Swiss-Prot record:
Keywords: Acetylation, Calvin cycle, Carbon dioxide fixation, Chloroplast, Lyase, Methylation, Monooxygenase, Oxidoreductase, Photorespiration, Photosynthesis, Plastid. It is found in: Plastid, Chloroplast. The gene is rbcL. Residues 1-2 form a propeptide. The basic functional RuBisCO is composed of a large chain homodimer in a 'head-to-tail' conformation. In form I RuBisCO this homodimer is arranged in a barrel-like tetramer with the small subunits forming a tetrameric 'cap' on each end of the 'barrel'. GO terms for cellular component: chloroplast. This is Ribulose bisphosphate carboxylase large chain. RuBisCO catalyzes two reactions: the carboxylation of D-ribulose 1,5-bisphosphate, the primary event in carbon dioxide fixation, as well as the oxidative fragmentation of the pentose substrate in the photorespiration process. Both reactions occur simultaneously and in competition at the same active site. Belongs to the RuBisCO large chain family. Type I subfamily. It comes from Ilex ciliospinosa.
């Protein structure tokens, strides 16, 4: 196993996991003629919140 090295993140980048539901909906998004609508049915595994399953 190789030794660990310290990596410095650039300014403005925060490591970590963001809550998914904060990132997938953008209410001020303006649609374009080239946008494509796609729909998928997702069934979460037991214990997984529906918004995290997608």
């Amino acid at each position: 196993m190789s030794p660990q090295t310290e990596t410095k993140a650039s300014v403005g980048f925060k490591a970590g996991v963001k809550d998914y539901k904060l990132n997938y909906y953008t209410p001020d998004y303006v649609t374009k003629d080239t946008d494509i609508l796609a729909a998928f049915r997702v069934s979460p595994q037991p214990g997984v919140p529906p918004e995290e399953a997608g």
